């Protein structure tokens, strides 16, 4: 088994999907969390100046979704067929496109709040409806078993609900999917013991 070291801030953020995958696959790793004050010094040492990074036996991987695909490759989390794998990637990318619209690093609080409000008020409802329609009456987003797309939905929606608690009031099927992911023993155990952070 390779030695894994995950480096990210002390928050869920873009590293949480990697942590869920490690938990589900029962893979041991070092969860190295850095403070904002240490970031400038660390940033200058990274090939692309961004985290999370995953060190695998000393070799550095970057980009959270690329890391997630690397870890889930040849596992049931990736999807059971090539077509399912494409659908998994499409749902993950759809969610990530939306999450990337938010000005997470904006320093002007009034500008940040206005943009968040617009996205949550006008854009989020359309995405929730699209996801609800896509899920339909199925148990999971893709195929007949859980994939990392379901994990990513739970992670992204947890963050969105911090800012818009009524986000899923009209989408009980999406709420049920969240609860199903949270009830998976390995995921439930991780959620229970992880550091509690806002984001």
Curated annotation (Swiss-Prot):
Induction: By 12-O-tetradecanoylphorbol-13-acetate (TPA).
Subcellular location: Cytoplasm
Keyword terms of this UniProt record: Calcium, Cytoplasm, Fatty acid biosynthesis, Fatty acid metabolism, Isomerase, Lipid biosynthesis, Lipid metabolism, Magnesium, Metal-binding, Prostaglandin biosynthesis, Prostaglandin metabolism, Transferase
InterPro entries associated with the record: Glutathione-S-Trfase_C-like, Glutathione-S-Trfase_C_sf, Glutathione_S-Trfase_N, GST_C, GST_superfamily, Thioredoxin-like_sf
Outcome (variant: residue 93 to N): Loss of activation by calcium or magnesium ions
UniProt main location, coarse: cytoplasm
Binding of glutathione, residues: 8, 14, 39, 49-51, 63-64
Required co-factors: glutathione
Catalytic activity field: prostaglandin H2 = prostaglandin D2; RX + glutathione = an S-substituted glutathione + a halide anion + H(+); 2-glyceryl-prostaglandin H2 = 2-glyceryl-prostaglandin D2
Any Gene Ontology CC annotation: intracellular membrane-bounded organelle
EC number(s) from the headed UniProt entry: 5.3.99.2, 2.5.1.18
Cofactor notes: Glutathione is required for the prostaglandin D synthase activity.
Tissue: Expressed in a number of megakaryocytic cell lines but not in platelets. Highly expressed in adipose tissue, macrophages and placenta. Also expressed at lower levels in lung, heart, lymph nodes, appendix, bone marrow and fetal liver.
PROSITE patterns: GST_CTER, GST_NTER
GO BP annotation list: glutathione metabolic process; locomotory behavior; negative regulation of male germ cell proliferation; prostaglandin biosynthetic process; prostaglandin metabolic process; response to nematode; response to selenium ion; signal transduction
Similarity-based family: Belongs to the GST superfamily. Sigma family.
Protein name: Hematopoietic prostaglandin D synthase
Gene that specifies this protein: HPGDS
């Amino acid at each position: 088994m390779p030695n894994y070291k995950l480096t990210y801030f002390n928050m869920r953020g873009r590293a949480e999907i990697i942590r869920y995958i490690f938990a589900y696959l029962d893979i041991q790793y070092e969860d190295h969390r850095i403070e904002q004050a240490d970031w400038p010094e660390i940033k200058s040492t990274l090939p692309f100046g961004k985290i999370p990074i995953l060190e695998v036996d000393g070799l550095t991987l970057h980009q959270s979704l690329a890391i997630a695909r690397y870890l889930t490759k040849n596992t049931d989390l990736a999807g059971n067929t090539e077509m399912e794998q494409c659908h998994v990637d499409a749902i993950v990318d759809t969610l990530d496109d939306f999450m990337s619209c938010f000005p997470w690093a904006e320093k002007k609080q009034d500008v940040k709040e206005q943009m968040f409000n617009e996205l949550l008020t006008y854009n989020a409802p359309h995405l929730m409806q699209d996801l609800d329609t896509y899920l339909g009456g199925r148990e999971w987003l893709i195929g007949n078993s859980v994939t990392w797309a379901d994990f990513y939905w739970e992670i992204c929606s947890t963050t969105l609900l911090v800012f818009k608690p009524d986000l899923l009031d009209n989408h009980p099927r999406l709420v049920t999917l969240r609860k199903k992911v949270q009830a998976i023993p390995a995921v439930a155990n991780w959620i229970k013991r992880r550091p509690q952070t806002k984001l």
